[in-house]
């Protein structure tokens, strides 16, 4: 009888462990799918010319350095913000690297999160394969360079300079059809027949 109850306890423990492992495996996948489904094109206003952005909450204007939409900002091309380069010190990705944020990895390397919608990457902030995209370019030590830009604005620039702006400041092809991430900017319309919202 004792061995039977001991067996039941072991079985219950194994079942609980299996549930924990399954939920741990499932969570990152769900988060990844949520991110992929929710990637938005920010509205950046003007591209910004050498915005001297210092990261944070909008330094250098929406399109230029730092802030939500633009390049790296911060110190040696780091910074971050929602749309720009990799966050942290000397371009380190830190928690903000990759995903919406942009480049990441060590000294501005793209790492897993480099490229895509976020922006730069490559060696010391070079655009590399991940440079450009919607978020913004890279260039040497975070410079926007000629390869910097895409829709989102220039790359980080040297010690946090905004870089060269980008092409058209990230205007939406068919207008805004909703709020952007955390109600900043906008969500671009996905199709030509989607009705843009009236913006105040």
UniProtKB/Swiss-Prot annotation:
Secretion signal, residue range per the UniProt entry: 1-24
UniProt keyword list: Cell wall, Cell wall biogenesis/degradation, Repeat, Secreted, Signal
Predominant localisation class: secreted
Pfam families: GRP
Domain of life: Eukaryota
Localization per Swiss-Prot or TrEMBL: Secreted, Cell wall
GO cellular component, one term: extracellular region
Any one biological process term the GO annotation gives: cell wall organization
Record's note on what induces expression: By wounding.
Family from the record: Belongs to the GRP family.
Purpose of the protein: Responsible for plasticity of the cell wall.
Name of the molecule in the record: Glycine-rich cell wall structural protein
Source species: Hordeum vulgare (Barley)
Gene: GRP
């Amino acid at each position: 009888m004792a061995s039977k109850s001991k067996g039941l306890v072991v079985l219950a423990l194994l079942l609980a462990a299996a549930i924990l492992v399954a939920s741990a495996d499932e969570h990152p996948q769900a988060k990844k799918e949520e991110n992929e489904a929710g990637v938005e094109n920010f509205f950046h206003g003007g591209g910004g010319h050498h915005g001297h952005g210092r990261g944070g909450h909008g330094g250098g204007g929406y399109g230029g350095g730092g802030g939500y939409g633009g390049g790296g900002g911060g110190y040696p091309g780091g910074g971050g913000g929602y749309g720009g380069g990799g966050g942290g010190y000397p371009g380190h990705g830190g928690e903000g690297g990759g995903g919406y944020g942009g480049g990441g990895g060590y000294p501005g390397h793209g790492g897993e999160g480099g490229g895509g919608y976020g922006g730069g990457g490559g060696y010391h902030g070079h655009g590399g394969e991940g440079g450009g995209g919607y978020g913004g370019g890279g260039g040497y030590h975070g410079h926007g360079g000629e390869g910097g830009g895409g829709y989102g604005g220039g790359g980080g620039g040297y010690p946090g300079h905004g870089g060269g702006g980008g092409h058209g400041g990230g205007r939406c092809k068919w207008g805004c059809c909703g709020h952007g991430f955390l109600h900043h900017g906008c969500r671009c319309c996905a199709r030509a027949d989607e009705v843009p919202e009236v913006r105040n």
